[in-house]
């Protein structure tokens, strides 16, 4: 296998394009800023499904045609590139360049093994986009940091993270999954103490804006979760962390609804106060309290879809194994 460069670069930005996608101006602007800081120690690698024309850039940039999940592409990157740090960023992300530069400065100066921040929703003009915004606030501001503080977190934002190559080289799960964030997070949770979790919003993305789009997304996440769960089942520590993650992200609403039922049984006013408090906690900005209330009622539909997908995939996986 040919290594891209024998000399060690400081920083490699890796992104991923699907068919009919091209390298975005947003990422190019970020890359130019990083090139001005790191010079020839900076490079960009684009994993693409189809080659496309790239205008000449002052920084080194390379297209690699490679099919498969983002996780498989990351594993492939470890085998061909020797940069000291990898920044993985989705092609559709609008990066917050100023905060990313500050984030990387701290990451490298303090010799962190891995780091990430928050990803925001770039627009919310209809009710589904508002639901996703509230769900992201709940995930990034409450569930994820709480689980990491309890030493049971495994979720990192797959849209953007930075890791030190030498710490993870040949250490990550040798599997295939849609959920690269959880596959990497499992290893981080168990073995990596030196992690930089920034409270800054490092980028934004356009949310799914239709009901069916969210259904299909959650179905795909369910497939990714269950295949990952089956692949690590014999690892007790990984299994425990993954099950806790699944409960916290996809079944917390059951507890919320159960408590809501209890409070309404006691007193209608008490029940309404409870719903109002929960809506206020998960809404940001605070003028979205009404939509947070709607979120509590509607969004469990997508968690149920996720659960059905998980059960369906596990049953099919076990039947497949029995036939082998």
Where are the regions a protein language model picked out?
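Cell-envelope/extracellular polymer assembly enzymes that use nucleotide-activated donors
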Residues: 9-14, 183
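Short, well-formed alpha-helical segments that are part of the catalytic scaffolds
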Residues: 19-35
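Short beta-strand/loop segment that forms part of the nucleotide-sugar
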Residues: 40-51
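Glycine-rich, basic loop-to-helix element that forms the pyrophosphate-binding segment
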Residues: 65-81
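Long helical/loop segments within the catalytic core of UDP-sugar-dependent glycosyltransferases
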Residues: 71-73, 97, 103-170, 175, ...
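Short beta-strand-to-loop acidic/aromatic patch adjacent to the donor-nucleotide binding site
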Residues: 83-94
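Catalytic donor/gating beta->alpha subdomain of glycosyltransferases that bind UDP-sugars
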Residues: 107, 114-140, 175-177, 182-242
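Membrane-embedded multi-pass helical conduit in multi-pass membrane proteins
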Residues: 249-320
């Amino acid at each position: 296998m040919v290594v891209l460069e024998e000399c060690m670069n400081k920083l490699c930005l890796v992104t991923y394009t699907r068919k009919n996608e091209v390298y975005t101006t947003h990422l190019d602007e970020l890359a130019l800023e990083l090139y001005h800081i790191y010079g020839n120690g900076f490079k960009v690698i684009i994993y693409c499904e189809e080659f496309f024309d790239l205008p000449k850039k002052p920084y080194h940039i390379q297209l690699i045609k490679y099919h498969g999940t983002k996780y498989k592409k990351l594993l492939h990157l470890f085998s061909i590139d020797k940069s000291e740090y990898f920044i993985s960023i989705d092609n559709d992300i609008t990066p917050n360049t100023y905060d990313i530069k500050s984030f990387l400065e701290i990451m490298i100066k303090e010799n962190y093994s891995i780091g990430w921040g928050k990803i925001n929703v770039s627009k919310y003009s209809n009710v589904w986009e508002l639901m996703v915004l509230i769900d992201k606030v709940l995930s990034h501001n409450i569930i994820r940091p709480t689980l990491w503080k309890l030493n049971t977190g495994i979720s990192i934002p797959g849209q953007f993270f930075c890791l030190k190559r030498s710490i993870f080289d040949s250490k990550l799960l040798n599997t295939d999954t849609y959920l690269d964030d959880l596959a990497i997070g499992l290893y981080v949770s168990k073995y990596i103490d030196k992690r930089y979790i920034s409270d800054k919003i490092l980028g934004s993305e356009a949310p799914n804006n239709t009901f069916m789009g969210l259904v299909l997304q959650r179905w795909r996440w369910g497939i990714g979760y269950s295949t990952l769960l089956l692949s690590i089942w014999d690892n007790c520590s990984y299994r425990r962390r993954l099950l806790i993650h699944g409960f916290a992200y996809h079944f917390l609403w059951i507890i919320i609804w159960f408590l809501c039922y209890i409070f309404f049984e006691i007193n209608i006013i008490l029940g309404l106060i409870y719903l109002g408090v929960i809506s206020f906690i998960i809404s940001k900005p605070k003028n979205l309290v009404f939509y947070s209330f709607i979120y509590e009622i509607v969004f469990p539909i997508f968690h149920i879809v996720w659960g059905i997908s998980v059960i369906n995939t596990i049953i099919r996986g076990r039947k497949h194994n029995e036939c082998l």
